[in-house]
Amino acid sequence: NYRSTQTIVKAANSVIRMNRKQIAKEVYSNKEPGVPIRVVKAAEDREEGFIVAGHISDLRFREQLAYSDFAVLYRTNAQSRIFEESLRRMNIPYRVFGSLSFYQRKEIKDVLAYFRLTVNPKDDESLKRVINYPLRGIGKTTLDRLEAYAGKLNTGIWTVLVHLDQVNLGFNRGTLAKLKGFTDLIRGFQDRLLKMEAFDMAYTIIRETGILDDLKSDQTPENVSRYENVEELLNGIKEFTENLEDDREMTLADFLQEVTLMTDADLEKDDDRNRVSI
């Protein structure tokens, strides 16, 4: 509160007084009164993000402010996606404090790796990321052997997997069964890829891989946050499919292309000190 204006502190005091279960206290500030608080109503989170980004862009232009003069506060980790996407769409540089950017979080990168592998089975990096996630008993030694054999043939790991019954890499029956299970899982997604629109395909992959069940199994605050992030990713895909200017059905490949554009490194070229803080 010592860094806040009197207007903000007075508003906070008004909220605190409403909590009758808390011991009464009065916070204060020695700073100037500051500008009045503005309350904006939005129909949904996408509109909220657009309003906030537009307000930042407008104020920066009218009052000759720096991006670093702005901060966006939100309550839960999953809420960062909508603000990040809104800022990116307006080419406003930002940095996330206390957390990773939404699309850089482990659980999101895991899900996107499944999406990419489904769309492009030659993506070895995505395959290596998810072949044993959620845990299915395929260890590093097995993966190293597959990768070495693929390198020897100058081909991809997926090609080796789909022809595993034609080669002898010294795997026991249990390991072969696990590898076949993974291969069949991805093939099943590939068979439905062009028959399903982006959201339905994404939800199918997240459900059938067991990612949601894995995140639900451990109710620590960190895992609850990860689960909420994956749900928020699905919300983003839903918005992507519903906010089209034409009647074309969007596929998972279309969504991945959109993600690539949104996470383009162009914004990273801006001065790291001159960014909106979120």
What residue ranges belong to the model's regions?
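Phosphate/pyrophosphate-binding and catalytic-coupling "lid/hinge/switch" segments at subdomain interfaces
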Residues: 2, 101, 135-136
